[in-house]
Amino acid sequence: MGNLLLVMAGGALGSGARHLFGRWTLAAFGPDYPYGTLGVNLIGGLAMGLLVGVLLRGEAGEPARLLLGVGVLGGFTTFSAFSLDVALMLERGELLVALGYVAASVIGSVVALFAGLSIMRSVA
């Protein structure tokens, strides 16, 4: 139960930070480009890399991974987990697997979004 609470608390913080960052970028740059989404994805990727480096050195343990990696970064951006998956594949020398995963994730997510929209429009 303690692990779940760490993830939930981190998720609340990450989601709140994403909301505030999105509002700030909207006010600063306007609605013409998704600067907020791009920003959280880039920040999340950097933060995930920093966290993994700390974890690999043994400077933090499982509670930090759950709170920060799964919780905060999961709430801030799921793109950070995706980026970590791709990096791990590349480090294992699985270039084609990584490229396939990137294509399937990005294209598949957009296709799934349109499928969801289509379903909802047909029942509206």
Where are the language model's segments positioned?
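Membrane-interface helix-loop junctions in multi-pass transporters/channels
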Residues: 1-124
